[in-house]
Amino acid sequence: MPTVATLDLSAHCVTACWLGDIPHFALADGSVHRLDHGHKTVDAHDGLLAAVPSLDGRTLLTGGEDGKVLALAPDGTVGAIGEIGRKWVNALAAGPQGAVAWASGRTAYVRLPDGKLRELQHSRTVEAVAFAPKGLRIAVARYNGATLHFPAAEGKPVELEWAGAHTMITFSPDGQFLVTAMQENALHGWKLVDGKHIRMSGYPAKVKSLSWGPKGRWLASSGAPAAIVWPFQTKDGPMGKAPLELGTRGDAMVTAVSFHPAEEIVAIGYADGMVLAARCADQKEVLLRRSGQGAVSSMAWDRQGRRLAFGTEAGDCGVVDISG
């Protein structure tokens, strides 16, 4: 039976994640908490808007209402990555070789592996940024589509158009597809080799959480009374295919999803704080956490896939251990 270690905090959990074996919880009030031989805290920002672990898992990158982008080490030491004055850093992404991208207003910033900073201007507000899995390429979500840049090189960006507001963005692990979440309760995808559109609609609510399966064969999403999991096994992705619906409940919406690092099993967090795990192959479900305070806002597995860190909008955080 899974065991749950709880950490009751007082603010919305923006990101639950792992640095090595240490679970971290970045809260909207600017504090970052970790469970490392006891509960420890770092006050990183005066208001935190985004947080992601670096690709090597050694630092937690954070962006705040104070215009700062910081890197927190597992021992709590804080280093500065960038500062853009009195602007909100509302989007953040970790890239290869230590590259970092963030956004404020209509500008995306990329700190390259050699430490140089590139500024990329856009005609509309940048809502989200993402790095491609290979090569130094970033994608920006904006109104009416997405923009692709190679920030280390001079050259024209590639514009991908689709009407509406795009609020999240992610590359498939093989780099073949780009997917955005939209304001209008839908996902939109582009097949990058030929620009073909992929419509993934029918959600009753806005999608706020996306997670790729370990081999990139599935993309899980929130925004419905079940985790909606789209198939990406073929060269055309989910074009013309129905998604899996995992962990269906009649009384609560799915608010967060997180795929296991090795198995095609997805952790599903709900608006009432419950967490289930469901398997793609046979849709079998296991209860990981009973309902609690606040909607689940973020979840992340450790590298071994034995422990799941979670956080809620009410600051109800913790770690589920499934190994016992």
Model-derived features: where do they sit?
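WD40-repeat beta-propeller superdomains and closely related acidic/aromatic-rich repeat-like regions
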Residues: 1-324
